């Protein structure tokens, strides 16, 4: 047998080059085969792409959810209602100036957005009536060192500028309240309160404490009162345009959500419970206000509801905020503040938020609640 025939190769000259015959070269015994078919490669690539997609969705889920939420329509003020809402401080409201947002409620109360009111008219009306506005804030435990000074300094710059203001700081350490230079016609009173062991109890103690203060010195020296959380700060004018008999704040995180998704208390045993067919908006307990008479009614309702829940051995999902939302369902607010008046920077940019007036401070719960 010829050598070339035995080895299965062709010599140069026979076909122009030395090459294998009978197809591909055979692999040696015991050597693994790493080649994948085209179908298997496609499946592998799809797996990796899906895995990276799910990882990206998990990592950026907050941004994606907020982008989707921003596309939920808010609705518009019905033409039949638009001429009706007026304001005792700003006069006729310009609802047509903000067609992209809801500027009134179904019961005819205005929702205050930037551009819908004239701030100068409100300031002049408040001065004409020589009003005194109370601002209450609770600074208990580490909330005092962490937030109070920034809150007060920013309030002096932006809250009811040019008006008579009395600050009521409720704290377990009145002697530690920082000194802040106050303008003419502005006072600060530090009021002692007991420090509770749980932060939930601190939150729920607010309503009975406010009720007592409104029935005492605060109610005697203030015409209107606003109750704010301390872990936020003013960044823009927060003036008399916000004043009304009963004022509620739309929650920045929930103002576009449909009603059935709102985090109301759903436990029927709770005094704060709302059914799936109840509720108008979700209101933020970080900002609410009104006349002394209206706030006496509000704080009494919430304090009583909390006591009933305590006797039943339950707590509402969002504590005093849940009871506040129940009150506003039963007693419609006469004015609503848009999320511009209490905004969270963690929420991605929204085109309808023109000038935030109040911003949430960074939440450091592990520090201030322990």
From Swiss-Prot:
Q: In which tissues is it expressed?
A: Thymus and lung.
The topology of this chain with respect to the membrane is:
Single-pass type II membrane protein
Per its UniProt entry, which superkingdom is the organism in? Eukaryota
Lumenal-side stretches of the chain, per the record, are: 66-370
Identify the keywords attached in UniProt to this record, alphabetized: Glycoprotein, Glycosyltransferase, Golgi apparatus, Lipid metabolism, Manganese, Membrane, Metal-binding, Signal-anchor, Transferase, Transmembrane, Transmembrane helix
Regions annotated as coiled coil: none
UniProt comment concerning the protein's domains: The conserved DXD motif is involved in cofactor binding. The manganese ion interacts with the beta-phosphate group of UDP and may also have a role in catalysis.
Q: What is this protein called?
A: Alpha-1,3-galactosyltransferase 2
This protein's species is: Mus musculus (Mouse)
What is the gene called?
A: A3galt2
